[in-house]
């Protein structure tokens, strides 16, 4: 965890805390691979998750990144179709146009089973809702087999 001394208003802090809880759970449940998969990918056996909070001009950025398997838009599309969230045509189009941002679709999860930390398809939608309610936005960047990075951009005001 890194911060350059950035202070957050209590309202923003609560929203960031809730969003970070979901992001960290997702990184653990979906992102960081097991030892065998990491070994096969040439990675260190221990996964890495970092959180950085910084001020940039009139915004506060909260960056949460893992060195896991990344997000597969095609897998998201298949899950959206199998759960009846999208038609096959809409899922293909969204995967091509939105890529990993499909992760914010309501009810979407790629988890095979429901656990205490994954599988209900509400966490990432909640992240987006929390940050939007604070006047911010969520950006997602990913590369299959390498990393996923979420950037929460919040107004400093």
Where are the regions a protein language model picked out?
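Conserved glycine-centered short motifs in functionally critical loops
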Residues: 2-157
């Amino acid at each position: 965890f890194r911060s350059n001394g950035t202070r957050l208003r209590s309202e923003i802090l609560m929203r960031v805390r809730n969003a970070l809880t979901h992001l960290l759970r997702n990184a653990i449940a979906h992102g960081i691979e097991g030892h065998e998969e990491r070994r096969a990918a040439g990675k260190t056996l221990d996964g890495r998750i970092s959180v950085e909070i910084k001020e940039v001009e009139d915004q506060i950025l909260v960056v949460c990144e893992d060195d896991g398997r990344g997000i597969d838009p095609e897998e998201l599309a298949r899950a959206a179709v199998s759960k009846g969230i999208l038609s096959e045509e809409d899922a293909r189009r969204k995967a091509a146009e939105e890529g990993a941002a499909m992760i914010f679709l309501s009810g979407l999860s790629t988890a095979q089973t429901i656990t205490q930390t994954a599988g209900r398809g509400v966490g990432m939608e909640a992240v987006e809702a929390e940050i939007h309610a604070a006047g911010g936005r969520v950006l997602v960047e990913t590369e299959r087999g390498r990393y996923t990075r979420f950037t929460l951009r919040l107004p400093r005001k």
